UniProtKB/Swiss-Prot annotation:
UniProt-recorded name of the protein: Cyclotide hyen-G
Domain note: The presence of a 'disulfide through disulfide knot' structurally defines this protein as a knottin.
Tissue expression notes: Detected in stems (at protein level).
Gene Ontology BP terms: cytolysis in another organism; defense response
Organism: Pigea enneasperma (Spade flower)
Record key words, sorted: Disulfide bond, Knottin, Plant defense
Post-translational modification: This is a cyclic peptide.
Lineage, uppermost ranks: Eukaryota, Viridiplantae, Streptophyta, Embryophyta, Tracheophyta
Disulfide bonds: C4-C20, C8-C22, C13-C27
Amino acid sequence: GLPCGESCVYIPCISTVLGCSCSNKVCYRD
């Protein structure tokens, strides 16, 4: 539920290594 300050509209979340995932074109963590 916390935004990771990254979008995933065109490319995947680089912050997935930090536990972030793509949701509604924005990377979130929990």
